Amino acid sequence: MATGMKDIKNRITSVENTMQITKAMELVASSKLRKAKEKAEKSKPFFDILYDTMVRIASAKTKQLSSVYVKPRKEKKAGFVIIGGDKGLAGGYNTNIFRKAEEKMSGREVCVLPIGKKAYEYFRKKGYPIVKRFENIPEEVEKVQVVDIVDTVIELYKNKEIDELYVIYTEFVSALTQIVRIKKLLPLYLKPRELEEEEYETVQYDPSPTAVFDNIVPLYLEGIFYVAVLESYASEQGARRIAMESATDNAGEMIEQLNLQYNRARQWNITQELSEIVSGAEALK
């Protein structure tokens, strides 16, 4: 029984060490989540203005807009930018988005541009054609780091290698709730709106509405991907925080059970020793 007590003590120490790690990971994930969400929220107003500008151009009475980005195409092949994580220990974060992506791509001719190591590994193993992979996008992602993504998808679209473009990412709602979002980016659908008369009189586009529009679209797409990456990163950290919190709680419960086992074993040892002493004393009488 002494050997058993030693084993239990070693297990308690091991679980305590693990609990310290999971607690630290939980705190780190909380901090990273908050920073990513704040950056995403601060960026949205600028890209909302870009979108509004594109809508104004598309709504103008001049009807001069003939951008390649808005012309409808007969769908042949769709490109999917799918944002996953680079690491594990995040509960069902990656599994959820991959399942939704496969549902959307089912029965279609597609190509995949995965963001994140986990996304690349999953869709490569599933046999999806990978056009280009994007990994190791840092937590402190900057807008310049999504330019490569935008340049790639625009080239594919202009060269008619894809006829539609989608982004699939996870929107952070709360640490307990993350929603998989699927957005169609190209061709752009801009809901026309009625412009005020003064808007027609004051807005002039040089050299042309289409040229200005075509220069805004890449910036707008950069904003979409930038916010999507940040939302996904916040969602990943939220899922990881919950997973680590659960692991910490489970470790605490395990330690309680092990301590109970240890105390029972210790009590049994004491009882056994007392019994042996009493038996020895009786034998001497």
Located regions from the model:
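C-terminal beta-strand-loop-alpha-helix "lid" module of Rossmann-like NAD(P)-dependent dehydrogenases
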Residues: 1-285
